């Protein structure tokens, strides 16, 4: 494995798997419990008996914008980077107003703030380890496999013999794990903006991080949008954009200039698959993504969806596009991975969710979504 750091903003690249358990960076020291003048002034701002959380709790008000952990007795609500006690994690966001998703927390494994976002990992009672970024669930160890298998196998199952692939995001390693099922692949570049996410993988998901050492893999710590813009034209067979929601550090990955750079980096008939939100909540975002893609990609533009139990509304969507060149029929896989060799199965284990029938069904949309997407 080759590791390249492209961070230029003074961020710390942690070596040998070291992780700052309290989020201290850049030589600063901010005690979590910071007692001063008899008051309790926490990192999230408890002062004089009031709560002034990062996400807006003050004097008994509740304006949660991000995930929080609360105690079982319900009398105290603590910010995601302020509690190390078992309780309940609740996911709040302006992207899904009026609803929340909660998980029982067995143990808080890691909490910290990188140069880009709040990072938290905890052991849940039902889904194993859970990774959150800025309070939003990104992946669960025992419930996230539908998302990962589909974001990899929908595009790669639609082209014959993919050889050069780029992953944007995916610093934990689940996406890479699935990609290694394809024996034709010769080169995998992974661009992860947040080095803390990679360090969390090394410490808590060593079986995934071990794949970063595969000789076909180059791990780049840097900005995915900038990397694609600088990529050699026509180099990649496929690009997988395993991003978080279109806010914060991932916002640029949903804009037209990014898609233009992706199209340039793909070979004729190359494919891209990107996370594309939920049809139940984000049709306005989906329509904008589709409009951008239709202006850029001259092959085909498709929307697919699947079920993920720990994502808002229980579903997530994908944009699948191809560049002009050899025709790509995303709805009918030509390289079905569910017929993989016994050797691959013995090394990586069987697929848990994806199969050729699921692949085809992913493009069948409810009437309301189909009419809006096709309009």
From Swiss-Prot:
Residues engaged in binding S-adenosyl-L-methionine: 117, 192, 223-224, 311
Gene ablation phenotype (knockout): Accumulation of anatabine at the expense of nicotine. Plants suppressed for PMT1, PMT2, PMT3 and PMT4 exhibit strongly reduced nicotine levels but accumulate polyamines in roots, and have an impaired leaf maturation phenotype at harvest.
Source taxonomy: Eukaryota, Viridiplantae, Streptophyta, Embryophyta, Tracheophyta
Residues forming the catalytic site: 242
Pathway listed: Alkaloid biosynthesis; nicotine biosynthesis
Induction of expression: Down-regulated by auxin. Accumulates upon the removal of flower heads and young leaves. Triggered by jasmonic acid (MeJA).
Tissue: Predominantly expressed in roots.
Keywords for the protein's UniProt record, in alphabetical order: Alkaloid metabolism, Methyltransferase, Polyamine biosynthesis, Putrescine biosynthesis, S-adenosyl-L-methionine, Transferase
GO CC, one annotated term: cytosol
InterPro entries: PABS, PABS_CS, Putrescine_N-MeTfrase, SAM-dependent_MTases_sf, Spermi_synthase, Spermidine_synt_N, Spermidine_synt_N_sf
Protein name: Putrescine N-methyltransferase 1
Segments of this protein annotated with the region Disordered: 24-77
Any coiled-coil regions, as ranges: none
